[in-house]
Curated annotation (Swiss-Prot):
Keyword Transit peptide assigned: yes
Localization, UniProt: Mitochondrion inner membrane
Complex and partners: Component of the TIM23 complex, at least composed of TIM23, TIM17, TIM50 and TIM21.
UniProt cross-references to InterPro entries, sorted A to Z: Tim21, Tim21_IMS_sf
Main location: mitochondrion
Family: Belongs to the TIM21 family.
Functional note: Essential component of the TIM23 complex, a complex that mediates the translocation of transit peptide-containing proteins across the mitochondrial inner membrane. Required to keep the TOM and the TIM23 complexes in close contact. At some point, it is released from the TOM23 complex to allow protein translocation into the mitochondrial matrix.
Keyword Coiled coil: no
Protein name as catalogued: Mitochondrial import inner membrane translocase subunit TIM21
The organism of origin for this protein: Eremothecium gossypii (strain ATCC 10895 / CBS 109.51 / FGSC 9923 / NRRL Y-1056)
Mitochondrial intermembrane side: 93-234
Membrane topology type: Single-pass membrane protein
Any Gene Ontology biological process: protein import into mitochondrial matrix
Bilayer-spanning residue ranges: 72-92
Length: 234
């Protein structure tokens, strides 16, 4: 017992001894309590203030990087949406526009199917209750189905007056014969649909058949030496 008491007495700290604390390694909240004043980087130890500045720089860089990433992603999304809108507009205008190649082609095929002379030249197998449908396709390089499914050959030009003209060429086929249809259409002043100016069918071994003939142009008569003599006539 005496030995244990002597050991405890030796471990007991003197009454007047002060507790030494390394405030430089204390966290911010404990440093505030120990010094009795609000905590800030001004009063904080140099090491802790430097850490705060590094954290602020890292946070600012993260914000800049996030903003740049968001801006780049937004630009990509807007660009993709713009390209998709243009493609959709071109597809819809091609399929449903009255002046599109698809609509002109469908009208031309219907005109050929409704012409009795053209059906006779193509030797359509028509009965009382049934009429043979024509197969129409673009320029072909073979007899198989895949090479026949090619785009229709068409061009567009402007005349001297600024009116647009459409030129198209495609093939028609029945179970017995084939032919080539060529047409010319021009922009109409009264309708959204171009009006057909010329359309004819060429069947091998047969005379060219005009489904639509162009209106003959009336030549203005000229007088002697190519001049019109006499008073002007309105």
């Amino acid at each position: 017992m005496l030995a244990f008491g002597s050991i405890c007495g030796r471990l007991r700290a003197p009454a007047g001894a002060g507790l030494r604390v390394n405030v430089g390694k204390m966290p911010g909240r404990a440093w505030q309590v120990a010094n009795g004043q609000p905590y800030s980087t001004f009063y904080a130890p140099p090491e802790q203030a430097g850490n705060r500045q590094k954290e602020r720089r890292v946070t600012a860089w993260k914000k800049v990087r996030a903003a740049a990433t968001f801006s780049a992603s937004g630009m990509l999304v807007l660009g993709a949406a713009g390209v998709a809108g243009i493609v959709l507009y071109l597809i819809l205008s091609e399929l449903f526009s009255p002046s599109g190649d698809t609509q002109i082609f469908n009208r031309a095929v219907s005109t050929v199917e409704g012409d009795a002379v053209a059906r006779s030249l193509l030797q359509c197998e028509d009965g009382v209750h049934r009429s043979e449908r024509l197969k129409a396709y673009g320029d072909s390089v073979g007899d198989d189905r895949w090479t026949r499914n090619r785009p229709i050959s068409s061009t567009r030009r402007l005349d001297a007056s600024g009116r647009e003209h459409y030129y198209m060429r495609f093939h028609v086929e029945t179970g017995r014969r084939r032919g080539v249809v060529s047409l010319e259409a021009q922009q109409s002043d009264d309708s959204y649909q171009p009006e057909f100016v010329r359309m004819y069918l060429d069947v091998p071994g047969e005379k060219r058949h005009y489904l639509i003939r162009p209106e003959p142009s009336v030549a203005k008569p000229k007088g002697f030496l190519g001049l019109n003599w006499g008073p002007r006539k309105d």
